Amino acid sequence: LIGLNGGTHKMRERYAEIDSKLLPMLSDNQECLSRINETIPKAGNIASYIQRNSQYPIYQNTDVMYFDEAVKGLETQLEDLAKAQKFIFMEYHAIEDAEAWHKIQKILEERVKVGVEVRIFYDDMGSIGFINTDFVKKMECVGIHCRVFNPFVPGLNLFLNNRDHRKITVIDGKVGFTGGYNLANEYFNYTHPYGQWKDTGIRLEGDAVQSLTVTFLEMWNAVSDKDANDPDFGKYIFHYDYKAQQTGFIQPYADSPMDNEQVGEEVYISMINKAEKYCWFMTPYLIITDEMTHALCLAAKRGVDVRIITPGIPDKKFIYNITRSFYHGLVKHGVRVYEWTPGFCHAKMSVVDDCMATCGTINLDYRSLYHHFENGCFMID
């Protein structure tokens, strides 16, 4: 059946075509790689892997703000959205037509009235139960351009297994947001279906936002036949004068089931293998391959402090039971697993040896690592 799935083959060709036009627009920033290799070689090797295999470069000249709660990210996001002058791009796995989204929509409508271009992109399956089928029409009626990824149609469609799990906001090509949270009330603890909700995110300002822009445009253009040769790519991807206060390096990257490279998993495994002192993760689901299990256990056997935080209250009991089934095999080799008892930990993060970290959408979960469209940020300091 997989071999006969012409829809998936067609999509692979389409993504390859769009990437061949978009990704070369990013600078290769070889001087940044050279500086990292001189100062933190183990991090430089991972940055080189990402750049060679996903074509997303490493940047400096970018300030990063970390949010330890999703609502803090939302509040900052609302402030930045209200300042938009040219364009706003938003891509999320789930949007709920409720309080949190209404705060965003109010600002988007105001910006549209002063000439700001606004594009919204969401995953249909991820938003089922959150919005009605007329959501796109409602957005278009107020001047907000809206597209849906892979609309759900009952029947045999193997491509339905590939969902858009990315979470990105880009404002004027200068400010960007990503992390674990979607645009639904539960993520901001406006509602509490699973106790307290724990999520994290980051705000970028500076050169690295270009990569988030490319990631958004890839998905936006992939779902419309007429946009593969969009002549307007250049007006959204540009360098502007910005002087960052921070001196670290950041590398936004994307992972896709439309190629044969599992960038998200390889970055995690590489970080684990490079760890010398500690390697810590937060993930809502823990359903991992033998390769990752081996890497985690081997690191613990080397004396690395390996810790994984998972939820104390699950959103899906069946998946929770599978997650817990991995505990014994890890713990017996020295990996420490903690459950976040106040509620559901949805954050997707890692930090290694005080010099490397990731934040984004990629879970320690087979679906996330192999089947979904994902994005992350690799950070070095």
Regions found by a protein language model. Name each.
Residues 1-265, 270, 274, 298, ...:
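N-terminal localization/anchoring segments of enzymes in phospholipid and broader phosphate metabolism
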Residues 285-307, 311, 316:
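Helical hairpin unit composed of two closely spaced alpha helices linked by a short loop
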Residues 337-341:
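Active-site donor-binding acidic/aromatic loop of nucleotide-activated sugar
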Residues 294, 320-324:
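Short glycine/threonine-rich loop-to-helix capping motif typified by GTGT followed
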Residues 199, 282-283:
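A short, conserved beta-strand element enriched in hydrophobic/aromatic residues
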Residues 259, 283, 287, 314-321, ...:
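A short glycine-/small-residue-rich loop at the edge of a beta-strand within enzyme catalytic domains
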Residues 348:
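Catalytic-core elements of nucleic-acid end-processing and repair enzymes
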